[in-house]
Amino acid sequence: ELEHPFTLVFTLANLSRIYTSFHNVNRALEFADEAIAVSTQYSFALGLALATASQGWALAEQGHEAGLGKLIHGISATRVTGANLNIPFTLALLAEIYLRNKRIDEGLGTIEEAQKLAGTGGELFWHAELLRLKGELLLAQSDLSVQAAEQCFSEALKIAQAQHATMLELRAATS
């Protein structure tokens, strides 16, 4: 057992985020719930915010309507702490939920915000995933957007290959 609650919270929150990137809902939720419990016990606002976002994503993936609200709350709470790291990734999760719920305009707006934040913050690791999701949203928006969507997928694939990001490359290639 780890006797340092601050380290424990961030380990749990980061494990939850890792499992969200693999779309492993059950493990993401398990670690998020643990991080929330410890964060609440010790009043760790950032750990609570990060874990709440992951928990919200997992619940939304399971079809719980409250999940979307928790995800949005987690993003807002993270921003309140002044932390900006991983916000583009979390916004990508939000855009994915919007896509699944056919809320295309909100999804596209979320992707646009994530791309701006990633560019200004130098957080470009998820750039390929943001482009892939933009392509998926464009495809869902209209048949007139097919060419723009294909361009997003192509660019996402090139970026993922250049970054040697195999997981993101596979996602882009299968979109």
Where are these regions (language model features)?
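Helix-coil-helix junctions within alpha-helical repeat/solenoid scaffolds
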Residues: 1-175
